[in-house]
Amino acid sequence: GRPVIVSDPVPPQSVIDHATEIGADLWLFGRDFNFTGDKQQWGWAGRGRRYSGLAYPALRGANQLVNASGVLAALEALRSEMPVTAQAIRNGLAMVELPGRFQIVPGQPALVFDVAHNAHAVAALTENLDAMGFYPTTHVVFGAMADKDVAPMLARVAPLVDRWYFCDLPTERAAKATQLQAVWQAGNARKDVQASTHANPQAALDAAVAAADPTDRIVVFGSFFTVG
């Protein structure tokens, strides 16, 4: 009977089946809670409670309302044991921080960190990058685990990338930079894009910084190890 919150709009059926099997109190996005919003504010509705006129979360990214909706569902599910006031929720949305999730470091060139490490997260990252506006050149530092299906990840963001810096990561579970570059080369159709390999994320980032102009953009993603 313990609550399980699923904010994925299209959750795996196995998750739903397992929650049902163990008798969990399953909260599904779109069934038990949802949100609406415009450019100025948003609202949330759960099983027995509603919030209106909420400010957008302080985090950047197109998927933040989905994430925030899941948090509000968790608070609603636990309200009898851990009551939280509406004002506390409003304050939390305004002050929330999550390093490494579409984290933009101001400066020249612009620097973006994102721990996106699957196709769904990279799709959100790509949408967010596209919304940032024009940059003459986008440099990408990329490292990933060996068990990840990196081909669709690279293909999704590739139209925005002008220079790749593939890197090894400090764990045996990681794919080698040369392996990542080979996957990229197999799917690359743009002859104007350059790529290089590096021994670690810092070396790759140093190379990107050295090559970038002040008006360019550098993006670091693929793993917590890459961003960390």
What are these regions (language model features)?
Residues 223:
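Active-site-proximal loop/hinge segments that shape catalytic or ion-binding/gating pockets
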Residues 9-23, 27, 36-41, 110-112, ...:
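C-terminal helical cap/extension that packs against the catalytic core
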Residues 3, 25, 137-139, 217:
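Proline-centered loop/turn at the N-terminus of a beta-strand
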Residues 1-51, 68, 72-90:
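Acidic, Mg2+-coordinating active-site environments of NTP-dependent enzymes
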Residues 45-163:
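Nucleotide phosphate-binding/pyrophosphate-handling subdomain across enzymes
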Residues 2-6, 52-55, 61, 192-196:
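General secondary-structure propensity
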Residues 6, 140-142, 166, 220:
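Structural beta-sheet core signal
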Residues 227-228:
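Short, basic/aromatic-enriched C-terminal tail that caps enzymatic domains
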